[in-house]
């Protein structure tokens, strides 16, 4: 089957155990290791939830690395890294960068919501906790108060800029994006983004909801007009764009996490077992702070028979 197609959870649940059991029985030691390049926003999701559950259920060992999705896909496309599995926080970006040369299919398995997390004891945090609209409080904040991700390295960064653009329209504040510049400071990685908030270097950060939950920080989700969590607003999101250094224009789109097993994977069977495990356990993914609507999982490209039967 090609193109975008829903795949029922029953299909995954019905055969997940068989595939995991088969691969667990014939792969041990180093051969059972699965190298995963994953979006940085999934660090705690995988380490605290998915990895222990998967390793407990199988003889496989995950070897995850975490990077911004733009960075990890570039590492694969330029031949620097050769993982078994890739997981991107932008499904379209994964297809654009990997299809044809490196992968033939992608499974979309989760969504997320954009917003702002904060330290309640800070001046900005107190205003947010008191109900001041985030954008008014942010404009008034001291310089370098709000950490944001680098748009050149990961989708969180360019979604933040797009959200600021859409927020300007939503709140009838045409200069909002420029007015927010003094208060924001760009960080080179998603891990540093929240580490600097936790250590008190910054009062807040624009993040995905699961990241705030991972770090036990209060989270204010942006409205549907610019949180990239409402599929019915896809056309509206697409009105915001970001242009990369190489001239590629990226349009706003709903947040969707996608994964694939690479064509040159060293452990194809293990990689497929891991992808099936993600699709077959939506409650585990939800417990980690991600959203799994009824529309997921879906896929692009022709799924391997082992994943589609």
From Swiss-Prot:
One of its GO terms (molecular function) is molybdate ion binding. Predicted to be exported by the Tat system. The position of the signal peptide cleavage has not been experimentally proven. GO terms for biological process: molybdate ion transport. SUPFAM superfamilies: Periplasmic binding protein-like II. The keyword Signal applies. Residues 1-32 form the signal peptide. It comes from the Archaea. InterPro entries: ModA/WtpA, TAT_signal. Keywords: Signal. Belongs to the bacterial solute-binding protein 1 family. WtpA subfamily. This is Uncharacterized solute-binding protein VNG_1595C. It comes from Halobacterium salinarum (strain ATCC 700922 / JCM 11081 / NRC-1) (Halobacterium halobium).
